[in-house]
Structures are given as structure tokens and as C-alpha cells.
A protein has these predicted regions:
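Non-catalytic cap/lid and distal C-terminal segments of serine-dependent acyl enzymes
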Residues: 1-187
Length: 187
């Protein structure tokens, strides 16, 4: 694979692989809802921008995005997402961004490049999403480019993304709603 090209490019190629190849293959073995409100996608670093791009390109499949230390920088043009968000028609997606002030801060060859400042670009994207009226939440920590902070708040991020799910107060309700069971495989 070529991660910078496959994950960081702002086009629909990766989204097509996920929605046209991966999801149908998974649906053969698992009972996956057809409702895009039930579908979330997330990642860290280049995986986070890839996840955002999948939902951006295919909100008919994914409506929730979890981004940890997202690479919304100029690896393959990710730094232009704030402008794309502001210029485009609003899409029906919900986004949770997580990053830290000690993430990669844009030093390149000894000089500062704002387009390669991970934290700055995540904040810019959050501000653009907010200005456009998106359902967006964020957590900024002191972390560097890694999993520690995002892992610590993962339950909070997941609860926020899926906060509008059904809740039963019936004491006799024993229906498991926390996960989906695999479909029965034909014998």
C-alpha cells in the first residue's frame, strides 16, 4: 500500500473501496444495518483523514466520524478541508475531532509551515465545521502524535457520536443493543 496516497488524497477512491468492496463483503457474514445513521468510521493520523473523506464523499453510507490526531495537513492537500467545508453544501455528518497541542507542529527543514501543523489544521477544520453548522465536538489535550489521549477518551467520543440511540428504562428489557451478532452462515 501507499498510505500517503491512499489515505490522504481528497477524492472518492478510498470511499469507493470501503463502500463498494469492503462493506458488501462484510455484509455477507454480518448483519449490518443499511441505515447510514448507524454507520460510523474513524481513524488516527492518516486513518483519520481517510475516515473523514469517506464520510465526506459518501454520507449516504457513513454519518459519524471519529478523528484522532487527524492528518488534515498538506500531505496530499488535507489543509484545504476547511475551505472545502465552507464552500460546499452542508452534509449530514457528525464529527468528533481529537488532537493535542504537542502534535506535529509544522517544522519542516527547520522552518515553520502552517500547512503542516497538525494541531493548527485540526482546529481550523473544527472552526469551519462549526461555522457551517455541523454537529461537531472536539477534545484538545497536550498530547503528541499518538494514541494515548485519544485512547483515554475513546468511550466519551463514542458516547457523543451515538448519543441519540434508543434507551429503555423497562426493568424487564434484556435486549442487547451494544453490538451486532454475525448473521447465520449457510450450511
Amino acid at each position: 500500500t501507499n498510505r500517503p496516497t491512499e489515505y490522504n488524497t481528497l477524492d472518492d477512491r478510498y470511499a469507493r473501496v470501503v463502500t463498494e468492496e469492503l462493506m458488501p463483503a462484510l455484509a455477507k457474514d454480518y448483519n449490518i444495518s443499511k441505515d447510514p445513521e448507524m454507520h460510523g468510521i474513524g481513524g488516527s493520523s492518516s486513518g483519520a483523514i481517510a475516515a473523514f473523506t469517506v464520510a465526506w464523499e459518501r454520507p449516504d453510507h457513513f454519518r459519524k466520524v471519529l478523528s484522532n490526531v487527524g492528518s488534515f495537513v498538506n500531505l496530499r492537500g488535507g489543509h484545504v478541508y476547511p475551505e472545502k467545508v465552507l464552500a460546499a453544501e452542508k452534509k449530514p455528518i457528525r464529527v468528533y475531532l481529537c488532537d493535542g497541542r504537542n502534535d506535529n507542529r509544522g517544522l519542516r527543514d527547520g522552518k515553520y509551515d502552517v500547512n503542516r501543523d497538525w494541531f493548527h489544521q485540526n482546529v481550523r477544520l473544527m472552526k469551519a465545521l462549526t461555522a457551517k453548522g455541523y454537529d461537531v465536538n472536539y477534545s484538545w489535550g497536550m498530547n503528541n502524535h499518538g494514541q494515548k489521549f485519544g485512547g483515554a477518551i475513546l468511550p466519551e467520543m463514542m458516547r457523543w457520536l451515538w448519543r441519540d440511540g434508543p434507551v429503555s428504562t423497562d426493568p424487564n428489557d434484556a435486549v442487547e443493543r451494544g453490538f451486532r451478532q454475525p448473521t447465520a452462515k449457510p450450511k
